[in-house]
């Protein structure tokens, strides 16, 4: 009856919750983070039936949703810095969403929380409903299950406990028997005292009688039997008091012995269970540690490319993790590039030599006289002066070239504070640490001497856009925005994304020029100068961070005369390269990461490029 009453009362309590209507459905446009390439994109989001779904647009809902998550176990987290953003995570899946304004965000959060509360996991009424049946079943069988499992491996202890119960029953019976005997004895003593009092009174009232012969006749009531009659207490017949006392003593001795044995068994069992507990605790600790590490790795993978881990002032990734991620990405790019180069070498044979009409002989040495076309591997541009290079950036080009020829070729000693950061054979890389508003602006200067090539050849390969993809591995795409002159072009190029750093693009003017020698002893000098400019055809965009550059490749050709009348070969020429780079990367990349990456990438670039030039010019006529 009580069970029925409890069920009825429980049902009456749930009636109001059952009658309450479902949560209100909601739909609208929210910005969703797609990936690090496309960033935030507007999506049509629908909140319905305790699930959150999104579509590309409202018009495409009939084609099905692009993604959906159940809100039962979802965690909604408003962002600490962005007032319009909130994140929804379910296990290792995370949605990054942005509303139009803070009020709009709060409306969405409230609606999602309401759906979550009304779901099976979030509702208290659901917990009561599901918990009631479980509690009834478990309450009925809990004790029996526990006792059964406890005694499965405890036969000795169970037997000793049975002995204790037997001792208890024996002791109770013995106590009852002895108590009964003592009560009977007490009743008998009381009755005997009353009888004695009565006998004494009768004796006092009994006078002697006169016999016929005149003698006194005394009564025999005063004899022993009359004065102290033998009274047997009722109820004590058949009780062996001595035997009961001995048995009682043995029982009381057996109880402590059995109890001691029980305690000993329990101590042994406790030690055994303690060892098992310690083992399980250690296993639990290892499991929790492995789970924690696994969850950490899963979170890293799930947030890979997430907006919180991107380069920025509020990035959640520290400098060490930032550098590790950048280094790992660069290593992957290097592996891909090595595979690509191996495939090119296997499939493509080196470019054939130009036809004979492109050469003329002077003495016994052949050199290129006719320029290559723009589509050829190298274009020869004979520029002795800048008189024909008149365009709107001419004055800026002149200033840049003069500055590089004046300062870039100076010795690294003195007060310039150049630091030698890399030295590999004849190649040396120097750096001056410069920061402005927290942004690293370190100028870098690299010098290297390359045998078998001329400065003209090196500069042509560095300037010519037709062969740029053959040696430049960091560019995603590029195009010529404007051709200012035969030796001056404006280029827009986008560099490959290296997560977590933001993607960079560069808009710069590239000019190649031959510097006239002031004296006969001065070496032949060529220069390629690249510096950032602005152009209406390539405005800033939100996808990339615009970097600013000022780069110069200065090459001087040194010729050692051949022995006798032999012709000049590539063994007699040496190119002294001076590469100077001033780069403002923009953005929020950590200074330590930028310096470490520059120290790694600049020497690798210079070695890769010069090796490429040596490979391309091997076996070809020398281009002075």
From Swiss-Prot:
An N-acylsphing-4-enine binds at residues 472, 493, 530, 579. Residues 23-117 form the PH domain. Phosphorylation on Ser-132 decreases the affinity toward phosphatidylinositol 4-phosphate at Golgi membranes and reduces ceramide transfer activity. Inactivated by hyperphosphorylation of serine residues by CSNK1G2/CK1 that triggers dissociation from the Golgi complex, thus down-regulating ER-to-Golgi transport of ceramide and sphingomyelin synthesis. Residues 389-618 form the START domain. Residues 1-11 have a biased composition (Polar residues). Residues 1-24 are annotated as: Disordered. A motif (FFAT) lies at residues 321-327. Signal peptide: none annotated. The modification Phosphoserine is found at residues 126, 132, 135, 315, 373, 377, 380. It is found in: Cytoplasm; Golgi apparatus; Endoplasmic reticulum. InterPro entries: PH-like_dom_sf, PH_domain, STARD11_START, START-like_dom_sf, START_lipid-bd_dom, START_lipid_transfer. Keywords: Coiled coil, Cytoplasm, Endoplasmic reticulum, Golgi apparatus, Lipid transport, Lipid-binding, Phosphoprotein, Transport. One of its GO terms (molecular function) is ceramide transfer activity. It catalyses: N-hexadecanoylsphing-4-enine(in) = N-hexadecanoylsphing-4-enine(out). Its main location: cytoplasm. One of its GO terms (biological process) is ER to Golgi ceramide transport. Interacts with VAPA and VAPB. Interaction with VAPB is less efficient than with VAPA. Interacts (via FFAT motif) with the MOSPD2 (via MSP domain). Shelters ceramides and diacylglycerol lipids inside its START domain and mediates the intracellular trafficking of ceramides and diacylglycerol lipids in a non-vesicular manner. The START domain recognizes ceramides and diacylglycerol lipids, interacts with membranes, and mediates the intermembrane transfer of ceramides and diacylglycerol lipids. This is Ceramide transfer protein. The gene is CERT1.
């Amino acid at each position: 009856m009580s069970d029925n009453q409890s069920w009825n009362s429980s049902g009456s309590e749930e009636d109001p919750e059952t009658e309450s209507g479902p949560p209100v459905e909601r739909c609208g446009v929210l910005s969703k983070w797609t990936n690090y390439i496309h960033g935030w994109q507007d999506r049509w989001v629908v909140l319905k039936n305790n699930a959150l779904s999104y579509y590309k647009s409202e018009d495409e809902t009939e084609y099905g949703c692009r993604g959906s998550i159940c809100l039962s176990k979802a965690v909604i987290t408003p962002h600490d810095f962005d007032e319009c953003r909130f994140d929804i995570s379910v296990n290792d899946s995370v949605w990054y969403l942005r509303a139009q304004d803070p009020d709009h965000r709060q409306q969405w959060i409230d609606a999602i929380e309401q759906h979550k509360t009304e779901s099976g996991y979030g509702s208290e009424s659901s917990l009561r409903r599901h918990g009631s049946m479980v509690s009834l079943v478990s309450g009925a069988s809990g004790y029996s299950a526990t006792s059964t499992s406890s005694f499965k491996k405890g036969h000795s202890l169970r037997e000793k406990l049975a002995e204790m119960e037997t001792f208890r029953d024996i002791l109770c019976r013995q106590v009852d028997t002895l108590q009964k005997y003592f009560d009977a004895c007490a009743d008998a003593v009381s009755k005997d005292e009353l009888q004695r009092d009565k006998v004494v009174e009768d004796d006092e009232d009994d006078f002697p009688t006169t016999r016929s012969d005149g003698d006194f006749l005394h009564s025999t009531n005063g004899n022993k039997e009359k004065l102290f009659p033998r009274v047997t207490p009722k109820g004590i017949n058949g009780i062996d008091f001595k035997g009961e006392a001995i048995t009682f003593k043995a029982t009381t001795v057996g109880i402590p012995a059995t109890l001691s044995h029980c305690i000993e068994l329990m101590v042994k069992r406790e030690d055994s269970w303690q060892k098992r507990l310690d083992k399980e605790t250690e296993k639990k600790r290892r499991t929790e540690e492995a789970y924690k590490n696994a969850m950490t790795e899963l979170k890293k993978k799930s947030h890979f490319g997430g907006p919180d881990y991107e380069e920025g002032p509020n990035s959640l990734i520290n400098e060490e993790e930032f550098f590790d991620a950048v280094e790992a990405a660069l290593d992957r790019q290097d592996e891909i590039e090595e595979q690509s180069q191996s495939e090119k070498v296997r499939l493509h044979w080196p470019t054939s030599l130009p036809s004979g009409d492109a050469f003329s002989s002077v003495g016994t040495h052949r050199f290129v006289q006719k320029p290559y076309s723009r589509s050829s591997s190298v274009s020869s541009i004979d520029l002795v002066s800048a008189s024909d290079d008149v365009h709107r950036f001419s004055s800026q080009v002149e200033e840049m070239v003069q500055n590089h020829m004046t300062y870039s070729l100076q010795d690294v000693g003195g007060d310039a504070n150049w630091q030698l950061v890399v030295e590999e054979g004849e190649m040396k890389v120097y750096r001056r640490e410069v920061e402005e508003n927290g942004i690293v602006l370190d100028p870098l200067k690299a010098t290297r001497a390359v045998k078998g090539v001329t400065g003209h050849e090196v500069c042509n390969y560095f300037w010519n856009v037709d062969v740029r993809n053959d040696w430049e591995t960091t560019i995603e795409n590029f195009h010529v925005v404007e051709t200012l002159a035969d030796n001056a072009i404006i280029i827009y190029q986008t560099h490959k994304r290296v997560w977590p750093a933001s993607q960079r693009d560069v808009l710069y003017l590239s000019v190649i020029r031959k510097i006239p020698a002031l004296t006969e002893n001065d070496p032949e000098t060529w220069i390629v100068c690249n510096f950032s400019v602005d152009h209406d055809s390539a405005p800033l965009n939100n996808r990339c961070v615009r970097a600013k550059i000022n780069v110069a490749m200065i090459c001087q050709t040194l010729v050692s005369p051949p022995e006798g009348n032999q012709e000049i070969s590539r063994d007699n020429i040496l190119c002294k390269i001076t590469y100077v780079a001033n780069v403002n990367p923009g953005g929020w990349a950590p200074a330590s990461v930028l310096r470490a990456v520059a120290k790694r990438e600049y020497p690798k670039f210079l070695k890769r490029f010069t090796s490429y030039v040596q490979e391309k010019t091997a076996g070809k006529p020398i281009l002075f």
